[in-house]
């Protein structure tokens, strides 16, 4: 038996928890603020459901084999309340978050060989606690090594593609290029289909060009045509698909703006690279949240 705890079972975390629980020898716990009776996910393969253990407090928890951290980056402090109870000497911790700073908050507190940063592209939306819509099977990428390979094995029974990659830095910045463009959706409160509007697409390209410049300075191998690749991906997606930044702004929740666009501004400044487009959307979305 493999014990797995998922901290923050929102759209992506809840979807992953449901898939993990489809394997009988996985014992899954979800760590939540708002309890629910079961997980129910509409997936491209059909509906799946699961009844993991639902924990609303870490008090009764013990260390597990795996912890999946799927909370937003601004919830790191709250995440430690759970990690203190769930992490033992052999526990591995996978960090499934947006951005390129996955492990930084955990270095020095959890042994590096037991940390697995993960880049995730699984379009999913949560309609209520425990209820998700997964629009595409999607993929997860983790660094090469024993921990990354062990993490990939957890999903061998699922249709989600798992890739163990040599150059994780490049993969993380490629995903950030996709995420940073999504700020346009949050600004105009329109789903993926807005990328068919050439004016919106040009703003998206500007955001991605800055991401490419900063990512290269950080050591990522990013192609010149990445902005066009990102737009093509948006245009090929379900036009009604809503990214998490858009969903959070529409719902009046805190936005993961720093991890998706602010990091480009911060890292750009450190390298002397101007990032006016990303700085502008950060300023506008911060103002919109006032």
Curated annotation (Swiss-Prot):
GO biological process: pantothenate biosynthetic process
UniProt pathway annotation: Cofactor biosynthesis; (R)-pantothenate biosynthesis; (R)-pantoate from 3-methyl-2-oxobutanoate: step 2/2
Binding, substrate: 98, 179, 244
Gene Ontology molecular function, alphabetical: 2-dehydropantoate 2-reductase activity; NADP binding
First-listed, main subcellular location of the protein, grouped into a coarse class: cytoplasm
Keyword entries, A-Z: Cytoplasm, NADP, Oxidoreductase, Pantothenate biosynthesis
SUPFAM superfamilies: 6-phosphogluconate dehydrogenase C-terminal domain-like, NAD(P)-binding Rossmann-fold domains
Enzyme class: oxidoreductase
Gene Ontology cellular component terms for the protein in this record: cytoplasm
InterPro entries per UniProt: 6-PGluconate_DH-like_C_sf, 6PGD_dom2, ApbA, Ketopantoate_reductase, KPA_reductase, KPR_N, NAD(P)-bd_dom_sf
Disulfide bond sites: none
Binding, NADP(+): 8-13, 98, 124, 256
Reactions this protein catalyses: (R)-pantoate + NADP(+) = 2-dehydropantoate + NADPH + H(+)
Domain of life where this protein originates: Bacteria
Active site: 175 (proton donor)
Entry protein name: 2-dehydropantoate 2-reductase
Organism: Caulobacter vibrioides (strain ATCC 19089 / CIP 103742 / CB 15)
Native organism taxonomy: Bacteria, Pseudomonadati, Pseudomonadota, Alphaproteobacteria, Caulobacterales
